[in-house]
């Protein structure tokens, strides 16, 4: 289709964020952009339970979560399951490159968030995306899947 929209690889997003206002804003922004937000949670256990019951194309996760476990452990679990995870944080962990497909630095705007998900989608499709300010892509495509 010459001028049509390209088919998205990332449609179903799981949001994991410990700040309620940020979680709400992310959910609204992504739903408005046409993504299916399968769930929004603030801790590791709820995130894993959502992964057990839902098909997820991408996890959008902060590093700091409610409870004892962190986004780092969630990224390890996501990697085992073959689900790409994009960190959204102001302080990415030293080993983020080994765990996630990339990182969008906080604070970010609605536009940056949407552009970041589009860039991840293009990356997963094998394309060289234009990266918005604050986004770094880490993983080769095959490492995310």
Predicted regions and their residues:
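Non-catalytic signal-transmission and effector/linker regions of two-component phosphorelay proteins
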Residues: 1-12, 109-145
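Two-component/phosphorelay signaling modules centered on CheY-like receiver
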Residues: 20-39
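Acidic, metal-coordinating helix/loop segments flanking the phosphotransfer/catalytic sites
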Residues: 27, 40-58, 66
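Conserved phosphotransfer microenvironments
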Residues: 61-79
